[in-house]
Amino acid sequence: MATPGNLGSSVLASKTKTKKKHFVAQKVKLFRASDPLLSVLMWGVNHSINELSHVQIPVMLMPDDFKAYSKIKVDNHLFNKENMPSHFKFKEYCPMVFRNLRERFGIDDQDFQNSLTRSAPLPNDSXARSGARFHTSYDRRYVIKTITSEDVAEMHNILKNYHQHIVECHGITLLPQFLGMYRLNVDGVEIYVIVTRNVFSHRLSVYRKYDLKGSTVAREASDKEKAKELPTLKDNDFINEGQKIYIDDNXKKVFLEKLKKDVEFLAQLKLMDYSLLVGIHDVERAEQEEVECEENDGEEEGESDGTHPVGTPPDSPGNTLNSSPPLAPGEFDPNIDVYGIKCHENSPRKEVYFMAIIDILTHYDAKKKAAHAAKXVKHGAGAEISTVNPEQYSKRFLDFIGHILT
């Protein structure tokens, strides 16, 4: 992939255009992770946010900010290799743009930094056809996904339009909330990652998960997927189970208005193959599991040898997760869990739904047109295949989602 163009006018970009080599003693703050690439991501995000905190925030973004990057190379024999690789490179794409997006999504840079650097991100077994790997930040607020160099190029192609869309909708969207994009190099291994806000709640567990495209051809989870603790189910699974999303008329109206606006934006950019990710929290089930957990904890305490339990260290995940005021069962903070919607009063079960659009970086190009032609021959022209043109895709997607909300 071609490296994004010249750095242009942003203050940060002009400071970081040239390659830096750092020979510094490792500070007290450690970035321990089982994977060296994760350690480098933690180090890089920490470095980036610290750099941004010293930069004057421009009144408006300039065209060159959408091509800018900052890059740093570290060669340091003083680093403790148990905690950090001694040689690595870290590159951040369009730092001022993503800083501006975080602000528009109501995310404070210090909070973002803490979420990604205080403790190592947690692996997530979510499957992607592309082979992408997923992690969540330790506090479960953000998702870190590996992407391809083609995805990075597509992100650069749409970033200006995406930013404008976020400005126009005042940050209230069902699109992925893109918060940072990075390249990491360690020991000859190069990966690209993108950070987004987690669609699911950071505290309410999801017991059912669906990836919905509005297509019925080959849209069923495999037996291997279904064997997982939390499988990603698909359209035919949703239909065959008779699943519905029970939200009241006002919540439905607001949701569909946002969805329509976002999907029209994607169609204009000729983007397709996106999905609605749906997570369902069962309030009564979660309460029951909590009671069982407390009973088990009580039994274990009764069997203890009388010594005092070790307290939660200040930097541990538990400390931050429990720092917010306690919420009643099924309640959530809408400033954090922005995609959450409660079920209506007549729902057969008391549920909370977390729904947003994911995987928006597929452009309708010659490859997709060829795939559409091949599938149409195989399944027939009227079949509900997923590779249709962006206008058809968006219409079918909106129709399907409209029908599952009740």
UniProtKB/Swiss-Prot annotation:
Residues 288-329 are annotated as: Disordered. In rod outer segments, activated by light. It is an enzyme of class 2 (transferase). Its main location: membrane. Its EC number is 2.7.1.149. Keywords: Acetylation, ATP-binding, Cell membrane, Cell projection, Cytoplasm, Kinase, Lipid metabolism, Lysosome, Membrane, Nucleotide-binding, Nucleus, Phosphoprotein, Transferase. InterPro entries: PInositol-4-P-4/5-kinase_C_sf, PInositol-4-P-4/5-kinase_core, PInositol-4-P-5-kinase_N, PInositol-4/5-P-5/4-kinase. The modification N6-acetyllysine is found at residues 89, 145. GO terms for biological process: 1-phosphatidyl-1D-myo-inositol 4,5-bisphosphate biosynthetic process; autophagosome-lysosome fusion; negative regulation of insulin receptor signaling pathway; phosphatidylinositol phosphate biosynthetic process; regulation of autophagy; vesicle-mediated cholesterol transport. The modification N-acetylalanine is found at residue 2. This is Phosphatidylinositol 5-phosphate 4-kinase type-2 alpha. It comes from Sus scrofa.
